[in-house]
């Protein structure tokens, strides 16, 4: 039912009947103005653009509740709205009202049909852009030029085996440079540690040495990602008509622009350096094995200066979407290890066994053999998702799309799934409320046909936190390797525990994003028998 539009029509009818039943001649002009203002306010509160979709709305407390109030409540009560919708309509479509428009939540049974649609019909990239603030997201370039994503998929992911040493080397550099000595029990804020580590490793994989350790580049890109995130959150938190004014008043947009200029200058100098070296030493020059080199080679030829600028913007856009989610996943995993301390020694023993077998070298095969850690990461992600919603898509076909059962989804609809609700459904996951760090390890061991399934970076209809199908998160394999290296090196070099009487940080929610106190500390101490990979 379209609650808002029905209410608006009733209010209009009652107002007109009231005016018709009285003599207009006896109505004071001030009363007319007040009545019109009341009418305008009611229309503003209750009007909703029809979606053309026959699906119920979750989150309404009554048919008379104004859509604007529901949209306001979504900012802080998205979790309960999504939970309510899934409980009532988990096998069918339902909708939720947000400031940026209504979104359609679909059940897993539609996923095969949806992910087989072409990007011209149903776009994953535009779904990502729309969900992160549209024109204010800072990632709109992805909709015009997807070379960064294609380079990550085709050049980086297939060559991760060659990048394992770089990941290990950069995290050890982070420990030596950014980490306290921890000779005795030392309080360490976990999330900032992971964010710094993930940023450093990402820079190494994306732009390589020496730029990845250039203070100008590191500081500018870190601030850029922070400001872009703040802008996205701010714009998602107000109605659309307020966004231009808010964007003008906030300090983050102009601070972000300054960071972009500084980062692009550093990146353009690096690209010019590489091109000059290639021209001078065309036979002896060894090209860098990083994302920047891949993007430079895959970019369409154009005017040199403009191409450098475009490539720089592509790299900054990729950097914006790369770091924070992986850092949060790592922090949650470490908190879960400490909260369920029996896993610390179990995972440490697995790491010792695996890496002693390969003479303490970090290899792709060794990371793949960390099956218990892989299971633990997947279970931690199930309990601590980075978003309550996922698999965002926008219908681009002007005629809309028709699903396998005949359901029609109109043009410009933003649709998604509810991964957290699905992976905590007792009909989908056995005993979903308990934390079993070996849940997926045991599933892989029980059935030989499941050996390649149920891994942290794989997706299926019961675990959709990375998306599903061809356009699932393109960086998930890199993120998996990063987290395994970071967590393994921490376990082998440090003892870790929580402060006395401290509890695991409890996540609240802002929109569909779980939030926790990022400064929550753990106690860490260098092990006497620490093992350096």
From Swiss-Prot:
Its cofactor is heme. Its EC number is 1.-.-.-. CDD domains: CYP503A1-like. Pathway: Secondary metabolite biosynthesis. GO terms for cellular component: membrane. It is a single-pass membrane protein. It is an enzyme of class 1 (oxidoreductase). Induction: Expression is down-regulated when the stress-activated mitogen-activated protein kinase (sakA) is deleted. Disruption phenotype: Does not produce lolitrem B and terpendole C, but accumulates lolitrem E and two other paspalanes, IDT522 and IDT538. InterPro entries: Cyt_P450 (IPR001128), Cyt_P450_E_grp-IV (IPR002403), Cyt_P450_sf (IPR036396). It is found in: Membrane. The chain crosses the membrane at residues 27-47. Heme binds at residue 473. Belongs to the cytochrome P450 family. Cytochrome P450 monooxygenase; part of the gene clusters that mediates the biosynthesis of lolitrems, indole-diterpene mycotoxins that are potent tremorgens in mammals, and are synthesized by clavicipitaceous fungal endophytes in association with their grass hosts. The geranylgeranyl diphosphate (GGPP) synthase ltmG is proposed to catalyze the first step in lolitrem biosynthesis. LtmG catalyzes a series of iterative condensations of isopentenyl diphosphate (IPP) with dimethylallyl diphosphate (DMAPP), geranyl diphosphate (GPP), and farnesyl diphosphate (FPP), to form GGPP. PANTHER family: CYTOCHROME P450, P450, PUTATIVE (EUROFUNG)-RELATED. This is Cytochrome P450 monooxygenase ltmK. It comes from Epichloe festucae (strain Fl1). The lineage of its organism: Eukaryota, Fungi, Dikarya, Ascomycota, Pezizomycotina.
